[in-house]
UniProtKB/Swiss-Prot annotation:
Record's compositionally biased regions (Pro residues): 314-323, 330-341
Low complexity composition-biased segments: 459-474, 482-493
Gene label: veA
Protein name in UniProt: Developmental and secondary metabolism regulator veA
Keyword annotations of the record: Cytoplasm, Nucleus, Sporulation, Transcription, Transcription regulation
Residue interval(s) of motif Nuclear localization signal: 39-44
Amino acid sequence: MATRAPLAPPPNETEASVSRITREGKKLTYKLNVMQQPERARACGAGAKSSADRRPVDPPPVVELRVYESDPNDDLNKTDITFAYNANFFLYATLETARPMAQGRFAPNPTCPVLTGVPVAGVAYLDRPSQAGYFIFPDLSVRHEGVYRLNFHLYEETKESKDANENAPIQSMSNPMPSKPMAPKSFLEFRLEVVSVPFTVFSAKKFPGLATSTSLSRVIAEQGCRVRIRRDVRMRRRGEKRTDDYDYDEERVYRSSDRISTPDTHGYAGTPVERPRSTSTSTVDPSFPYGVDAQRRSSGATEYGFQGAQPYQRPLPPAPGPAPAAVSTPAPPAPPAPPSHNPGYQSHLSFGSTQTQYPAPQLPPTPQTASTLAAPYSPHPSYSHARNPSTSAEYETPGYSYPPSRMSTERSSYPKNGLPPLRLEPPKPLNMPSGEPRSSDPNAYHSVAQSAAPRSQTPSSSLVPSLPPLKALSGDYPNNLSQSSSSTSQSPSHDLGAGKKFFWDTGASLSKRSYEDSFGHDDRPLYNGMRPDTESYPRRLSDASRNFYNETRDEMAYKRANGRMATKISPALQ
């Protein structure tokens, strides 16, 4: 079967010319040349946003116009009068398919125009690339994909009567100098038509991209015409990887990587990447328990307004294997020493790990020793709290991640006389009343600590089921534990004056305190116009608060509006 021969190009493709005789008997020749052919375009669609989303034909079509004058009997001697010819020229562009389609039997449905944009261009007289008139179409878009041609129709508006057609009536010419403004009576004459070569309109998925602007577009843009100039290649590379010589800024990649990387401040090879703190202590990495900011964190005493000593830290030997969770005890105030972190120390609770923060007033914190791990709540916020449940035992035996015999031997090597005496308060037994004042004598505290240490060796196995067997503990463990507990306190020394007590009741209790015991009535919200001194407002204080007011603040003094001073008993004690 014979294949169909390709369609022959039209005779007016790319170039076309036409001649006419003027009223004065001169011959004018019009010549159109499509200097820049359209090559590709992306379909802009027919949706609601197609008019705003322009996809111009690339490169923009450029048509050159030249006008020649000659004698009707001598076509060889022509004179270029493009710049001297006094007339207005317009070029109108239309779109047609490259392969004509047969008409169907039924009438086609009415469709919107396929060509959008600005299809009309006026002549621009430019000196480069040569002296001629140019028509530029920088804003032509096609709605649907396919293969098309552009038809350019030239229209002329003559301004002088001598340039009219030979058979044109005289009255049809307009007066060049009207006496008063009036509607124009001039009209346009169609001169000739030229078509472009076929070009392809791609869909958005298949569009290869825009190429660099041509030299002709640059020359035209330099002379003041509106042409979009692209100095970089925007062609898609399908199936190829990006190379270093194609739009790749190596320095920009380095800058972005430096901006998101976290430097290793300690130089550990096995240091994990630091992550945000969480409120759970079970997710702390045992190989790096202290964190990066442990050496910069101040003690709880510094948070309350007075300076605390630097915690003493020393490198510990690596653990032989996994062991139950250990409870960290505060370090004693000692001369500043360079902090060192040991990645081999196995612990789930430490100073650098997460800490439970409780709102509390600025009051002196109470120390917490190793023998009172289940002591009642203290407003000091910088202690690590154990997660092991405790029902009613006041003293618990802490678990360690290495054999206690080695720990007792190492702790016995601490200097015993290098630390200043501390005025600490001994823990209260369960049968001691909560309102009894604390003793500030360090000798009494030392004796109580010596007597309380043996109790920690014999707790009930039902209360602490997760502790290691007690038979592994050495005989000198209680003495060393009491000695180390007194030397591992983090709170600074705080001396209470005679006759003064803590405002908050820090005695032992087996249940949580109520809201009224923890906070005064000044902290309660006021509703429905309630005032602190009204009868409908609760004024109940804790026992410790009442004792404090009875001893130091039985009467309150205030100034009246008339300037007179008045005193009365505090309403909280009535």
